[in-house]
């Protein structure tokens, strides 16, 4: 989905148990099937410019304008981004 912050449009996806395959596709990593779905708590490694970080369930994963990835907690994401039509 597309979101906007201060005029800049980015792609982002929220990590949850119902969209793990889409998150893996978004990140360009293999979907490990049921091993993701049974992980408790749900976490996924995300390669960011600062190194590997973990995205927790309900965190947003943002793809920046140069293709880089960032993670963002849900409350911070909602304060800073709005859905692009």
PLM regions with names:
Residues 1-49:
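N-terminal domain-onset segments
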Residues 50-85:
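Short, compact, well-ordered microdomains
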